[in-house]
Each structure stands twice: as structure tokens, then as C-alpha cells.
Amino acid sequence: MKILVSACLMGENCKYNGGNNYSEKLHEFLKGHDVIMVCPEVMGGLPTPRLPSEIVGDRVVNSGGIDVTNEFVLGANKAMEYITGIDMAILQSRSPSCGTNEIYDGTFSGNKIKGDGIFVRMLKEKGIKVVDIKDL
């Protein structure tokens, strides 16, 4: 299988705080599969580290109040260039790019709501199966 994954889950230090979300469980699952790693946020030109961002209505805003929607959309569009032939995507939980079925509520309080990140919305529109890492 050809599987697209959030780069942070593979140990790439592209998370907003400069770290990663390496998953040994994912690493084991991916053995024998073709893997494509993406970080839509970095692909959209956002630095690492960066202020955390959350979806607020139809915009993405960082904790400093700056609208970063354009960067998130640009990065998601660039990441979409890598989907040809993929069988599924396994992505980071609650991310404003990669969150699947659950994201933070936009108040930077840690509260979660039902919803998808920007990149996940695009993947689902193309009929691609998206799995949250916590559901693997």
C-alpha cells in the first residue's frame, strides 16, 4: 500500500513547538508499505517553531491573533500534489491541518469539537480514506 503520513508522526521536527509526535506503533504498521511524509504547515511556509494555530469559523488564526489561513491553504494544496496513487492517509490528531473528526475549538483553551483540519477536508473531498493516528 501507498500511505501518506503526517511528517511529525515519523519523527520530523515540524510540529508548532519545534518537536515531533513520533509514533512507534505507526512506524511498525508502515513496514513494507510505500510512505509519503508531508507537513502541510511547513509546506505552506510557516516556520518551526511557530505559534499554535486553531480553526476559528472559516479562518485559521494563531495564538497571537494573526490570520494564517492563506499559509494553511497553500500548504494543504501543496501536500495534495503528493496524493496520486495513495491508498490512505494517517494523520496527526486535532491539528488544524491534519486533525480528523476532532479539532480544537478555536479558543486556545484545550477544548475540542467535531471537525476536520484544512488538509483533511481536501483529502476527504477526493474520497481518500483518512485515519487519525489515535485510531490506528
Please name every model-derived segment.
Residues 22-36, 74-89:
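Short amphipathic alpha-helices and their capping/turn segments at secondary-structure boundaries
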Residues 1-4:
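Extreme N-terminal starter segment of soluble prokaryotic enzymes
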Residues 78-107:
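N-terminal glycine-rich phosphate/adenylate-binding segment common to multiple enzyme folds
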Residues 8, 92-95, 135:
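Short, well-ordered beta-to-alpha junction loops that form the rim of enzyme active sites
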Residues 21-62:
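Short, surface-exposed acidic-centric catalytic microdomains
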Residues 11-18:
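Short N-terminal binding/cap micro-motifs at the start of the first secondary-structure element
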Residues 43, 52-55, 59-81, 111-136:
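Divalent-metal-activated hydrolytic enzyme cores
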Residues 37-40, 89, 131-133:
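General beta-strand structural signal in soluble alpha/beta enzymes
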